[in-house]
A protein has these predicted regions:
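N-terminal accessory interaction module
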Residues: 44, 54-55, 60, 66-80, ...
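Short alpha-helical segments and helix-capping/turn motifs at coil-helix boundaries
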Residues: 30-32, 41-46, 66-71, 88-92, ...
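Hydrophobic, aromatic-lined core segments that form the binding pocket/scaffold
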Residues: 148-404, 417
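Compact, glycine/acidic-enriched structural inserts
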Residues: 80-82, 86-144
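Acidic, carboxylate-rich catalytic segments that either coordinate divalent cations
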Residues: 391-437
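N-terminal ordered "arm"
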Residues: 7-66, 79
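Short loop/turn segments at secondary-structure transitions that flank enzyme active sites
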Residues: 65-67, 90-92, 111-113, 185, ...
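N-terminal "leader" segments that precede or initiate the main folded domain
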Residues: 1-7
Length: 437
Protein backbone atom coordinates (compact mmCIF):
# COMPACT_ATOMS: atom_id res chain seq x y z
CA UNK A 1 0.00 0.00 0.00
CA UNK A 2 2.70 2.40 -1.14
CA UNK A 3 0.25 5.20 -1.92
CA UNK A 4 -0.92 5.24 1.70
CA UNK A 5 2.69 5.32 2.92
CA UNK A 6 3.25 8.35 0.66
CA UNK A 7 0.23 9.95 2.31
CA UNK A 8 1.45 9.23 5.83
CA UNK A 9 4.83 10.80 5.01
CA UNK A 10 3.32 13.83 3.25
CA UNK A 11 0.99 14.68 6.14
CA UNK A 12 3.29 13.50 8.95
CA UNK A 13 0.70 11.04 10.21
CA UNK A 14 3.36 9.14 12.14
CA UNK A 15 5.06 9.48 15.55
CA UNK A 16 7.77 12.12 15.20
CA UNK A 17 10.02 10.34 17.69
CA UNK A 18 11.84 8.08 18.03
CA UNK A 19 12.74 7.59 14.34
CA UNK A 20 15.94 5.83 13.32
CA UNK A 21 17.65 4.58 10.18
CA UNK A 22 18.11 0.86 9.70
CA UNK A 23 21.66 1.20 11.05
CA UNK A 24 20.53 2.94 14.24
CA UNK A 25 21.05 6.66 13.50
CA UNK A 26 18.47 9.12 14.82
CA UNK A 27 16.17 10.79 12.28
CA UNK A 28 14.27 14.06 12.62
CA UNK A 29 11.91 15.04 9.80
CA UNK A 30 12.22 18.82 9.48
CA UNK A 31 10.38 19.17 6.14
CA UNK A 32 8.79 16.29 4.22
CA UNK A 33 9.44 18.09 0.92
CA UNK A 34 7.35 18.76 -2.16
CA UNK A 35 5.29 15.81 -3.43
CA UNK A 36 6.28 14.88 -6.98
CA UNK A 37 3.56 13.16 -9.03
CA UNK A 38 5.76 12.83 -12.11
CA UNK A 39 8.91 10.87 -12.97
CA UNK A 40 11.73 11.05 -10.44
CA UNK A 41 11.96 10.83 -6.64
CA UNK A 42 8.71 10.98 -4.69
CA UNK A 43 9.50 14.13 -2.67
CA UNK A 44 11.77 17.00 -3.67
CA UNK A 45 13.76 19.31 -1.38
CA UNK A 46 13.03 17.49 1.84
CA UNK A 47 14.96 18.34 5.01
CA UNK A 48 15.93 15.58 7.42
CA UNK A 49 18.36 15.66 10.33
CA UNK A 50 20.29 12.39 10.64
CA UNK A 51 22.45 11.99 13.73
CA UNK A 52 22.43 15.77 14.15
CA UNK A 53 23.42 16.60 10.56
CA UNK A 54 20.86 18.40 8.38
CA UNK A 55 20.44 16.92 4.92
CA UNK A 56 18.53 18.64 2.13
CA UNK A 57 17.54 16.58 -0.88
CA UNK A 58 15.02 14.06 -2.17
CA UNK A 59 13.08 11.28 -0.44
CA UNK A 60 12.01 8.06 -2.13
CA UNK A 61 9.30 5.82 -0.67
CA UNK A 62 8.62 2.12 -1.32
CA UNK A 63 6.68 -0.72 0.26
CA UNK A 64 9.79 -2.88 0.11
CA UNK A 65 13.37 -1.65 -0.16
CA UNK A 66 13.99 -4.09 -3.02
CA UNK A 67 11.51 -2.11 -5.14
CA UNK A 68 14.40 0.35 -5.57
CA UNK A 69 16.08 -2.18 -7.85
CA UNK A 70 12.82 -3.37 -9.41
CA UNK A 71 12.18 0.21 -10.58
CA UNK A 72 15.74 0.67 -11.82
CA UNK A 73 16.66 3.50 -9.46
CA UNK A 74 20.16 2.04 -9.07
CA UNK A 75 20.75 2.94 -12.73
CA UNK A 76 19.03 6.33 -12.71
CA UNK A 77 21.05 9.44 -11.82
CA UNK A 78 17.89 11.27 -10.77
CA UNK A 79 17.95 9.21 -7.57
CA UNK A 80 21.56 9.99 -6.67
CA UNK A 81 20.41 12.92 -4.50
CA UNK A 82 18.09 10.82 -2.33
CA UNK A 83 18.90 11.70 1.29
CA UNK A 84 16.46 9.19 2.80
CA UNK A 85 14.84 5.99 1.53
CA UNK A 86 11.60 5.37 3.45
CA UNK A 87 10.22 1.81 3.36
CA UNK A 88 7.70 -0.41 5.08
CA UNK A 89 9.95 -3.46 4.77
CA UNK A 90 13.75 -3.13 4.67
CA UNK A 91 14.62 -6.35 2.85
CA UNK A 92 17.83 -5.10 1.14
CA UNK A 93 20.44 -2.35 1.24
CA UNK A 94 20.11 -0.06 -1.79
CA UNK A 95 22.70 1.77 -3.89
CA UNK A 96 22.62 4.73 -6.27
CA UNK A 97 24.07 4.83 -9.78
CA UNK A 98 27.24 6.27 -8.18
CA UNK A 99 27.52 3.36 -5.77
CA UNK A 100 26.50 5.37 -2.70
CA UNK A 101 24.23 3.90 -0.03
CA UNK A 102 21.48 6.36 0.94
CA UNK A 103 20.20 6.20 4.53
CA UNK A 104 17.19 3.95 4.89
CA UNK A 105 14.37 4.20 7.42
CA UNK A 106 11.51 1.84 8.18
CA UNK A 107 8.18 3.62 8.53
CA UNK A 108 4.90 1.78 8.97
CA UNK A 109 1.44 3.11 8.27
CA UNK A 110 -0.15 3.55 11.72
CA UNK A 111 -2.82 0.93 12.36
CA UNK A 112 -5.55 3.52 12.95
CA UNK A 113 -4.75 5.27 9.65
CA UNK A 114 -4.75 1.97 7.78
CA UNK A 115 -8.04 0.94 9.39
CA UNK A 116 -9.71 4.27 8.65
CA UNK A 117 -8.54 4.16 5.04
CA UNK A 118 -9.97 0.67 4.61
CA UNK A 119 -13.24 1.94 6.07
CA UNK A 120 -13.37 4.70 3.46
CA UNK A 121 -12.65 2.32 0.60
CA UNK A 122 -15.17 -0.27 1.77
CA UNK A 123 -17.96 2.16 2.65
CA UNK A 124 -21.07 1.87 0.53
CA UNK A 125 -22.62 5.00 2.01
CA UNK A 126 -22.05 8.38 0.39
CA UNK A 127 -20.15 10.31 1.52
CA UNK A 128 -17.98 7.65 3.19
CA UNK A 129 -16.49 10.23 5.59
CA UNK A 130 -19.92 11.38 6.83
CA UNK A 131 -19.05 10.59 10.46
CA UNK A 132 -16.67 13.56 10.76
CA UNK A 133 -18.35 16.16 8.53
CA UNK A 134 -20.45 17.87 11.18
CA UNK A 135 -17.43 18.33 13.47
CA UNK A 136 -15.11 19.91 10.89
CA UNK A 137 -13.92 23.49 11.51
CA UNK A 138 -15.69 26.03 9.31
CA UNK A 139 -12.35 27.23 7.93
CA UNK A 140 -11.51 23.70 6.75
CA UNK A 141 -14.86 23.34 5.00
CA UNK A 142 -14.83 26.79 3.38
CA UNK A 143 -11.25 26.56 2.13
CA UNK A 144 -11.84 23.12 0.58
CA UNK A 145 -15.10 24.17 -1.06
CA UNK A 146 -13.37 27.25 -2.48
CA UNK A 147 -10.60 25.10 -3.95
CA UNK A 148 -13.13 22.65 -5.39
CA UNK A 149 -15.14 25.47 -6.95
CA UNK A 150 -12.03 26.73 -8.74
CA UNK A 151 -11.09 23.19 -9.74
CA UNK A 152 -14.50 22.69 -11.33
CA UNK A 153 -14.21 25.95 -13.26
CA UNK A 154 -10.74 24.94 -14.43
CA UNK A 155 -12.17 21.65 -15.66
CA UNK A 156 -14.93 23.41 -17.57
CA UNK A 157 -12.37 25.84 -18.98
CA UNK A 158 -10.47 22.92 -20.49
CA UNK A 159 -13.65 21.69 -22.19
CA UNK A 160 -14.32 25.18 -23.57
CA UNK A 161 -10.73 25.47 -24.81
CA UNK A 162 -11.20 22.19 -26.67
CA UNK A 163 -14.34 23.62 -28.29
CA UNK A 164 -12.48 26.77 -29.31
CA UNK A 165 -9.86 24.62 -31.04
CA UNK A 166 -12.58 22.54 -32.73
CA UNK A 167 -14.19 25.81 -33.88
CA UNK A 168 -10.91 26.92 -35.46
CA UNK A 169 -10.23 29.52 -32.80
CA UNK A 170 -13.67 31.13 -32.82
CA UNK A 171 -14.80 32.00 -29.30
CA UNK A 172 -18.22 33.09 -30.60
CA UNK A 173 -18.77 29.67 -32.18
CA UNK A 174 -17.49 27.91 -29.06
CA UNK A 175 -19.94 29.92 -26.95
CA UNK A 176 -22.82 28.92 -29.21
CA UNK A 177 -21.83 25.25 -28.90
CA UNK A 178 -21.53 25.55 -25.11
CA UNK A 179 -24.87 27.32 -24.84
CA UNK A 180 -26.54 24.73 -27.06
CA UNK A 181 -25.08 21.85 -25.06
CA UNK A 182 -26.60 23.21 -21.89
CA UNK A 183 -29.98 23.67 -23.57
CA UNK A 184 -30.01 19.87 -23.46
CA UNK A 185 -30.06 20.01 -19.64
CA UNK A 186 -28.06 16.80 -19.31
CA UNK A 187 -30.21 14.24 -21.11
CA UNK A 188 -29.72 15.63 -24.62
CA UNK A 189 -26.52 17.56 -23.89
CA UNK A 190 -24.22 15.50 -26.12
CA UNK A 191 -26.70 15.59 -29.00
CA UNK A 192 -27.16 19.33 -28.68
CA UNK A 193 -23.39 19.79 -28.89
CA UNK A 194 -23.22 17.55 -31.97
CA UNK A 195 -26.07 19.55 -33.51
CA UNK A 196 -24.50 22.93 -32.69
CA UNK A 197 -21.23 21.88 -34.30
CA UNK A 198 -23.19 21.11 -37.48
CA UNK A 199 -24.58 24.65 -37.67
CA UNK A 200 -22.50 26.88 -40.00
CA UNK A 201 -23.00 30.16 -38.16
CA UNK A 202 -21.75 32.15 -41.11
CA UNK A 203 -24.55 30.68 -43.24
CA UNK A 204 -27.42 30.94 -40.79
CA UNK A 205 -26.26 34.47 -40.01
CA UNK A 206 -27.45 35.56 -43.46
CA UNK A 207 -31.00 34.72 -42.33
CA UNK A 208 -30.83 35.85 -38.68
CA UNK A 209 -33.47 38.56 -39.25
CA UNK A 210 -36.10 36.00 -40.31
CA UNK A 211 -37.09 33.91 -37.29
CA UNK A 212 -39.04 31.42 -39.42
CA UNK A 213 -35.93 30.71 -41.51
CA UNK A 214 -33.79 30.36 -38.38
CA UNK A 215 -36.30 27.84 -36.98
CA UNK A 216 -36.26 25.92 -40.26
CA UNK A 217 -32.45 25.98 -40.31
CA UNK A 218 -32.12 24.81 -36.71
CA UNK A 219 -34.86 22.16 -36.74
CA UNK A 220 -33.77 20.90 -40.15
CA UNK A 221 -30.14 20.53 -39.09
CA UNK A 222 -31.39 18.64 -36.05
CA UNK A 223 -33.00 16.08 -38.35
CA UNK A 224 -36.39 16.84 -36.79
CA UNK A 225 -38.14 17.82 -40.02
CA UNK A 226 -38.28 14.16 -40.99
CA UNK A 227 -41.49 12.76 -39.51
CA UNK A 228 -39.96 9.27 -39.35
CA UNK A 229 -37.69 10.31 -36.45
CA UNK A 230 -40.45 11.94 -34.37
CA UNK A 231 -42.22 10.12 -31.53
CA UNK A 232 -44.70 7.59 -33.04
CA UNK A 233 -47.77 9.35 -31.66
CA UNK A 234 -47.18 12.46 -33.78
CA UNK A 235 -45.71 11.14 -37.05
CA UNK A 236 -48.93 11.03 -39.04
CA UNK A 237 -50.16 14.32 -37.60
CA UNK A 238 -46.84 16.00 -38.43
CA UNK A 239 -47.07 15.08 -42.10
CA UNK A 240 -50.49 16.74 -42.24
CA UNK A 241 -49.40 19.81 -40.26
CA UNK A 242 -49.14 22.96 -42.40
CA UNK A 243 -46.43 24.55 -40.25
CA UNK A 244 -44.33 21.38 -40.39
CA UNK A 245 -44.69 21.29 -44.17
CA UNK A 246 -43.64 24.95 -44.47
CA UNK A 247 -40.58 24.41 -42.28
CA UNK A 248 -39.59 21.29 -44.21
CA UNK A 249 -39.92 23.13 -47.52
CA UNK A 250 -37.89 26.09 -46.23
CA UNK A 251 -35.14 23.82 -44.92
CA UNK A 252 -34.95 22.02 -48.27
CA UNK A 253 -34.26 25.41 -49.88
CA UNK A 254 -31.62 26.32 -47.25
CA UNK A 255 -30.00 22.89 -47.50
CA UNK A 256 -29.55 23.32 -51.25
CA UNK A 257 -28.27 26.87 -50.83
CA UNK A 258 -25.67 26.03 -48.17
CA UNK A 259 -25.04 22.31 -48.88
CA UNK A 260 -26.35 21.35 -45.45
CA UNK A 261 -26.32 17.84 -44.03
CA UNK A 262 -28.49 17.28 -40.94
CA UNK A 263 -27.49 15.11 -38.01
CA UNK A 264 -29.34 11.85 -37.40
CA UNK A 265 -32.70 12.82 -35.90
CA UNK A 266 -33.03 9.42 -34.22
CA UNK A 267 -30.38 10.50 -31.71
CA UNK A 268 -32.72 12.85 -29.89
CA UNK A 269 -34.33 11.58 -26.71
CA UNK A 270 -37.99 12.33 -26.03
CA UNK A 271 -38.87 9.35 -23.85
CA UNK A 272 -39.50 10.12 -20.17
CA UNK A 273 -38.79 13.82 -20.68
CA UNK A 274 -41.16 16.50 -19.50
CA UNK A 275 -42.74 18.14 -22.57
CA UNK A 276 -41.06 21.49 -21.87
CA UNK A 277 -37.70 19.70 -22.18
CA UNK A 278 -38.48 18.17 -25.59
CA UNK A 279 -35.68 18.98 -28.04
CA UNK A 280 -38.22 20.60 -30.37
CA UNK A 281 -39.03 23.21 -27.71
CA UNK A 282 -35.42 23.78 -26.65
CA UNK A 283 -34.27 24.25 -30.26
CA UNK A 284 -37.06 26.74 -30.99
CA UNK A 285 -36.18 28.66 -27.81
CA UNK A 286 -32.55 28.79 -28.90
CA UNK A 287 -33.61 29.88 -32.38
CA UNK A 288 -35.42 32.86 -30.87
CA UNK A 289 -32.41 33.71 -28.73
CA UNK A 290 -30.19 33.62 -31.81
CA UNK A 291 -32.68 35.63 -33.90
CA UNK A 292 -32.73 38.37 -31.27
CA UNK A 293 -28.93 38.54 -31.17
CA UNK A 294 -28.74 37.18 -27.62
CA UNK A 295 -26.72 34.03 -28.32
CA UNK A 296 -23.39 35.79 -28.81
CA UNK A 297 -20.41 35.92 -26.46
CA UNK A 298 -20.03 39.67 -26.86
CA UNK A 299 -23.51 40.16 -25.38
CA UNK A 300 -22.62 37.96 -22.41
CA UNK A 301 -19.39 39.85 -21.76
CA UNK A 302 -21.40 43.10 -21.63
CA UNK A 303 -23.54 41.76 -18.77
CA UNK A 304 -22.39 43.33 -15.51
CA UNK A 305 -24.84 41.65 -13.11
CA UNK A 306 -26.78 38.46 -12.48
CA UNK A 307 -29.99 40.26 -13.44
CA UNK A 308 -28.55 41.21 -16.83
CA UNK A 309 -27.38 37.64 -17.47
CA UNK A 310 -30.85 36.33 -16.59
CA UNK A 311 -32.45 38.81 -18.98
CA UNK A 312 -30.01 37.80 -21.72
CA UNK A 313 -30.85 34.10 -21.38
CA UNK A 314 -34.62 34.47 -20.90
CA UNK A 315 -36.47 33.29 -23.99
CA UNK A 316 -39.78 31.91 -25.20
CA UNK A 317 -41.24 30.35 -28.36
CA UNK A 318 -43.05 31.45 -31.52
CA UNK A 319 -46.89 31.38 -31.66
CA UNK A 320 -47.13 27.89 -33.20
CA UNK A 321 -45.13 26.38 -30.34
CA UNK A 322 -47.26 28.11 -27.71
CA UNK A 323 -49.89 25.46 -28.50
CA UNK A 324 -47.58 22.58 -29.46
CA UNK A 325 -44.80 20.49 -27.94
CA UNK A 326 -44.64 18.22 -30.98
CA UNK A 327 -45.63 18.79 -34.59
CA UNK A 328 -49.32 18.28 -35.28
CA UNK A 329 -50.44 17.72 -31.68
CA UNK A 330 -52.10 20.72 -30.06
CA UNK A 331 -51.78 21.39 -26.34
CA UNK A 332 -52.90 24.03 -23.87
CA UNK A 333 -51.49 27.47 -24.73
CA UNK A 334 -48.26 28.31 -22.92
CA UNK A 335 -45.50 30.83 -23.65
CA UNK A 336 -42.97 28.18 -22.61
CA UNK A 337 -40.58 30.62 -21.03
CA UNK A 338 -37.59 29.37 -19.10
CA UNK A 339 -38.22 28.92 -15.40
CA UNK A 340 -36.00 30.76 -12.92
CA UNK A 341 -34.29 27.46 -12.06
CA UNK A 342 -33.55 26.76 -15.75
CA UNK A 343 -32.02 30.20 -16.21
CA UNK A 344 -29.95 29.63 -13.07
CA UNK A 345 -28.64 26.34 -14.48
CA UNK A 346 -27.78 28.01 -17.79
CA UNK A 347 -25.97 30.74 -15.87
CA UNK A 348 -24.00 28.21 -13.83
CA UNK A 349 -23.10 25.90 -16.70
CA UNK A 350 -22.75 28.38 -19.57
CA UNK A 351 -22.30 32.01 -18.53
CA UNK A 352 -19.99 31.38 -15.57
CA UNK A 353 -17.48 29.02 -17.25
CA UNK A 354 -17.47 31.07 -20.47
CA UNK A 355 -16.70 34.30 -18.62
CA UNK A 356 -13.98 32.54 -16.63
CA UNK A 357 -12.43 30.86 -19.68
CA UNK A 358 -12.64 33.97 -21.85
CA UNK A 359 -11.22 36.08 -19.03
CA UNK A 360 -8.27 33.69 -18.78
CA UNK A 361 -7.80 33.84 -22.56
CA UNK A 362 -7.86 37.65 -22.63
CA UNK A 363 -5.90 38.10 -19.41
CA UNK A 364 -8.90 39.97 -18.00
CA UNK A 365 -9.13 39.30 -14.26
CA UNK A 366 -12.37 41.28 -13.99
CA UNK A 367 -14.18 38.72 -16.16
CA UNK A 368 -12.81 35.88 -14.03
CA UNK A 369 -13.94 37.60 -10.83
CA UNK A 370 -17.34 38.24 -12.40
CA UNK A 371 -17.73 34.49 -12.92
CA UNK A 372 -17.17 33.86 -9.20
CA UNK A 373 -19.47 36.75 -8.30
CA UNK A 374 -22.28 35.16 -10.31
CA UNK A 375 -21.85 31.86 -8.47
CA UNK A 376 -21.94 33.62 -5.12
CA UNK A 377 -25.05 35.59 -6.12
CA UNK A 378 -27.01 32.46 -7.06
CA UNK A 379 -28.65 30.18 -4.52
CA UNK A 380 -27.38 26.63 -4.23
CA UNK A 381 -28.72 24.14 -6.75
CA UNK A 382 -31.29 21.61 -5.64
CA UNK A 383 -30.21 18.07 -6.48
CA UNK A 384 -29.54 14.76 -4.77
CA UNK A 385 -25.83 15.51 -4.27
CA UNK A 386 -26.49 18.76 -2.42
CA UNK A 387 -29.27 17.14 -0.40
CA UNK A 388 -27.04 14.24 0.65
CA UNK A 389 -24.38 16.59 1.99
CA UNK A 390 -27.04 18.62 3.83
CA UNK A 391 -28.17 15.48 5.64
CA UNK A 392 -24.65 14.88 7.00
CA UNK A 393 -24.25 18.45 8.20
CA UNK A 394 -22.86 20.42 5.27
CA UNK A 395 -25.40 22.85 3.84
CA UNK A 396 -24.64 24.54 0.53
CA UNK A 397 -25.58 28.22 0.62
CA UNK A 398 -24.62 29.41 -2.88
CA UNK A 399 -24.24 27.97 -6.36
CA UNK A 400 -20.50 28.12 -5.73
CA UNK A 401 -20.98 25.73 -2.82
CA UNK A 402 -23.19 23.34 -4.79
CA UNK A 403 -20.76 23.32 -7.72
CA UNK A 404 -17.97 22.49 -5.29
CA UNK A 405 -19.96 19.57 -3.85
CA UNK A 406 -20.67 18.24 -7.34
CA UNK A 407 -16.94 18.39 -8.07
CA UNK A 408 -16.19 16.66 -4.77
CA UNK A 409 -18.51 13.76 -5.54
CA UNK A 410 -17.50 13.22 -9.15
CA UNK A 411 -13.75 13.83 -8.91
CA UNK A 412 -13.10 12.39 -5.45
CA UNK A 413 -15.89 10.36 -3.81
CA UNK A 414 -16.92 8.38 -6.90
CA UNK A 415 -13.28 7.57 -7.65
CA UNK A 416 -12.38 6.80 -4.03
CA UNK A 417 -9.73 9.53 -4.14
CA UNK A 418 -9.92 9.99 -0.38
CA UNK A 419 -6.17 10.54 -0.13
CA UNK A 420 -6.50 13.66 -2.28
CA UNK A 421 -9.47 15.03 -0.33
CA UNK A 422 -9.20 17.37 2.65
CA UNK A 423 -12.26 15.79 4.25
CA UNK A 424 -10.61 12.40 3.76
CA UNK A 425 -7.51 13.74 5.51
CA UNK A 426 -9.59 14.84 8.48
CA UNK A 427 -11.14 11.36 8.63
CA UNK A 428 -7.79 9.58 8.46
CA UNK A 429 -6.08 11.64 11.13
CA UNK A 430 -8.95 11.44 13.62
CA UNK A 431 -8.75 9.09 16.57
CA UNK A 432 -11.53 6.55 16.97
CA UNK A 433 -12.93 8.71 19.78
CA UNK A 434 -13.13 11.74 17.48
CA UNK A 435 -14.69 9.71 14.69
CA UNK A 436 -17.44 8.20 16.82
CA UNK A 437 -18.44 11.13 19.01
Amino acid sequence: MEELLHYVWKHKLFPLAPLTTTDGKSVEVVDVGLHNRHAGPDFFNAKVRIDGTLWVGNVEIHDKASDWFVHGHDRDARYDNVVLHVVDIADVVVRTSQGATPPQMVLHVPDRVRDHYQELLAAEDYPPCHAVISSLPRLTVCSWLSALQTERLEQKTEAISDRVKACEGSWEAAYFVTLARNFGFGVNGDIFELWARSIPLGSVGHHRDDLFQVEAFFLGQAGLLDSAVLPPRCREAADEDTYFQRLRSEYAYLARKFSLRPIDGHLWRFLRLRPQNFPTIRIVQLARLYHEGRAGLSRLVDCASLHQVAELLATSVTPYWETHYLFGLESRRSEKRFSASSIALLTINTAVPMLFAYGRHKGDEKLCYRAFDLLEALSAEKNHIVETWRKVGLKAQTAGDSQALIQLKRAYCDRKECLRCRFGYEYLKKTDHDKNR
